[in-house]
């Protein structure tokens, strides 16, 4: 498997502001299907699974989950069987209508659909015991992929070439990626996380995995109403940004985060000559699924 792990930093020139420097770390280019933070989160988990003799990976996710797609692709690439426990039993007959689930299935993942009520019990020991009875031995990956080994992988996102940046900006889902960045950032750097969903619970989740509470904060103003929710302003921004920079953005995570960073620059949040590193966490597979939903609503599509 070929991975692109070098020379990922791409400077971006802003048409409206020459006093703040933006560089995007193109983690989306690491691999066509196992890209961005998903590669980072899976790396050491795969090593552990292999060392412990597991042949099967089991994980959880929703209908358009980047983690489900990446885990399926990982299994295909590395010879693991994969099982995806999918939220929403109504999706059982709609696999081919859903680009993410169709990709996962074609990549060899066995999909088990459960009700949303049962999905809430996914971390309960009785439920995991039932899964072990059904599927025998498996290596468990949590929803979103965040655990201690995932944090270890995300700590490798920043390299020695990144120490000259003042701010590091990243989208936040389960909190694993930002935790890795917080742990590896230099003392003079500030990490800004942009949650893709509503709720202040993420702060405590992130604290579980971090060594410092001083060098980071969450910007909760750019979730666009919650997880998976977008509007025409965000679509316009994503499409315009791609035209101007040739960098595609996903609408769930990186698109929202970059919209927020640009808005903050316009409102003078950052001082002159500030150097900002933006982490592109991939997730581009989700564009196709989002466009299906946008088309149903008669809204503009993401290019």
What are these regions, as identified by a protein language model?
Residues 1-303:
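PLP-dependent amino-acid enzyme catalytic core
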């Amino acid at each position: 498997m070929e991975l692109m792990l070098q020379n990922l930093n791409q400077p971006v020139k802003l048409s409206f502001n020459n006093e703040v420097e933006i560089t995007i770390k193109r983690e989306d280019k690491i691999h066509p299907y196992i890209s961005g933070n998903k590669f980072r989160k899976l790396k050491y988990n795969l090593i552990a699974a292999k060392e412990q003799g597991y042949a099967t990976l089991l994980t959880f996710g929703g209908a358009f989950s980047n983690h489900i797609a990446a885990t399926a692709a990982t299994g295909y690439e590395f010879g693991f069987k994969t099982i995806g426990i999918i939220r929403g039993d109504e999706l059982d007959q709609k696999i081919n209508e859903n680009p993410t689930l169709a990709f996962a299935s074609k990549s060899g993942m066995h999909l088990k659909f459960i009700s949303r009520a049962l999905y809430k019990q996914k971390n309960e020991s009785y439920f995991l015991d039932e899964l072990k009875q059904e599927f025998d031995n498996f290596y468990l990956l949590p929803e979103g992929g965040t655990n201690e080994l995932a944090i270890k992988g995300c700590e490798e996102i920043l390299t020695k070439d990144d120490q000259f940046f003042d701010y590091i900006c990243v989208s936040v889902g389960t909190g694993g990626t930002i935790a890795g960045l917080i742990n590896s950032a230099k003392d003079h750097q500030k990490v800004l996380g942009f949650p893709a969903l509503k709720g202040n619970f993420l702060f405590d989740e992130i604290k579980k995995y971090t060594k410092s509470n001083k060098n980071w904060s969450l910007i909760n103003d750019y979730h666009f109403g919650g997880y998976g929710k977008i509007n025409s302003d965000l679509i316009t921004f994503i499409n315009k940004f791609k035209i101007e920079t040739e960098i595609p953005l996903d609408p769930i995570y990186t698109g929202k985060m970059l919209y927020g960073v640009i808005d903050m620059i316009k409102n003078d949040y950052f001082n002159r000559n500030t150097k900002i590193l933006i982490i592109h966490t991939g997730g581009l597979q989700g564009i196709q699924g989002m466009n299906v939903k946008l088309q149903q609503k008669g809204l503009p599509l993401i290019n």
